From Swiss-Prot:
GO cellular component entries: cytoplasm; nucleoplasm; nucleus
Family, per entry: Belongs to the NOSIP family.
Record GO terms (molecular function): molecular sequestering activity; ubiquitin protein ligase activity
Stretches the record annotates as U-box-like: 55-75
Phosphoserine modifications at: 36
Its job: E3 ubiquitin-protein ligase that is essential for proper development of the forebrain, the eye, and the face. Catalyzes monoubiquitination of serine/threonine-protein phosphatase 2A (PP2A) catalytic subunit PPP2CA/PPP2CB. Negatively regulates nitric oxide production by inducing NOS1 and NOS3 translocation to actin cytoskeleton and inhibiting their enzymatic activity.
Organism phylogeny: Eukaryota, Metazoa, Chordata, Craniata, Vertebrata
Keywords for this protein: Cytoplasm, Developmental protein, Nucleus, Phosphoprotein, Transferase, Ubl conjugation pathway
Sequence segments annotated as region (Disordered): 126-156
InterPro entries (UniProt xref): NOSIP, Znf-NOSIP, Znf_RING/FYVE/PHD
Classification via PANTHER family: ENOS INTERACTING PROTEIN, NITRIC OXIDE SYNTHASE-INTERACTING PROTEIN
Written domain comment of the UniProt record: The U-box-like region is a truncated U-box domain. It is unknown whether it is functional or not.
Identification of the protein by name: Nitric oxide synthase-interacting protein
Family annotation (SUPFAM superfamilies): RING/U-box
Length: 302
């Protein structure tokens, strides 16, 4: 007996494992992967730097950012929009000049043709026995040079580009730029974002005697500002806009929504002032966070 049946290539069926392995190695098809806990950021980490925030701010949609990182992002986006707008205006001006040049050349050709016809001594009389198409305005004098009544294939061959003839060499046209949007968008939600929309966030540390460096090494760093419950990715929490305090959603539903008063500053609250913080998830499917990452790549179709 040989060991042919023990080899991984001896099977007559293309297995799912072999298909996934070949797809990953080929560079084609959409790749899917299930994210684990190690690939999920903590609730108090910046969405850009993925590091614990020193001066956190939150957007109206609940995405947490480091103030320095998000302001640098907004500044970079404004510079990029200005650069794209400058390139768009430059191309637009070049197209206008090109159109004017073509109109000017067409007008000069029209004048030149009129002067040549007027200066000619001998002109052929119009033939009244011409086809309808010619009597509609296309006389023998208006016929294009080199055109014939031959088959359509010959005319098509004449219109084909020729790389060895300078006059028939195809021209590579520049890509037409679309007018860029002047609105800076949030890198996570894609919605419009302004500096005035950012709300400062004040986390309540678990132990006020421990400095920031010591808090980073702990798994439980912050607590609810009202109930003193521990905050983590497994605890849904919200930010109160007037004070910036972080509280649990359970505290919001059971205590704060009854009077709609900020427990820290005493100011009146509205539904817009309660910002639900976007958590990173726990790695479990029941955490309510999408834990499936996809990467779209070219697809080969038969």
């Amino acid at each position: 007996m040989t060991r042919h049946g023990k080899n991984c290539t001896a099977g007559a069926v293309y297995t799912y494992h072999e298909k996934k392995k070949d797809t990953a190695a080929s560079g084609y098809g959409t790749q899917n992967i299930r994210l684990s806990r190690d690939a999920v950021k903590d609730f108090d980490c910046c969405c850009l730097s993925l590091q614990p925030c020193h001066d956190p701010v939150v957007t109206p949609d609940g995405y947490l950012y480091e103030r320095e990182a998000i302001l640098e992002y907004i500044l970079h986006q404004k510079k990029e929009i200005a650069r794209q707008m400058k390139a768009y205006e430059k191309q637009r001006g070049a197209r206008r000049e090109e159109q004017k040049e073509l109109q000017r050349a067409a007008a000069q050709d029209h004048v030149r043709g009129f002067l040549e016809k007027e200066a000619a001594i001998v002109s052929r009389p119009l033939n009244p026995f011409t086809p309808k198409a010619a009597s509609a305005g296309n006389g023998p004098d208006d016929a294009q040079p080199g055109s014939s009544a031959g088959p359509a294939g010959k005319d098509k061959d004449k219109a084909l580009p020729s790389f060895w003839i300078p006059s028939l060499t195809p021209e590579a046209k520049a890509t037409k730029l679309e007018k860029p949007s002047r609105i800076v968008t949030c890198p996570m939600s894609g919605k419009p974002l302004r500096m005035s929309d950012l709300t400062p966030v004040r986390f309540t540390p678990l132990d006020s005697s421990v400095d920031r460096v010591g808090l980073i090494t702990r798994s439980e760093r912050y607590v609810c500002a009202v109930t003193r419950d521990s905050l983590s990715n497994a605890t849904p929490c919200a930010v109160l806009r007037p004070s910036g305090a972080v509280v649990t959603l359970e505290c919001v539903e059971k205590l704060i929504r009854k009077d709609m008063v900020d427990p820290v500053t005493g100011e009146k609250l509205t539904d817009r002032d309660i910002i639900v913080l976007q958590r990173g998830g726990t790695g479990f499917a029941g955490s309510g966070v999408k834990l499936q990452a996809e990467k779209s790549r070219p697809v080969m179709q038969a």
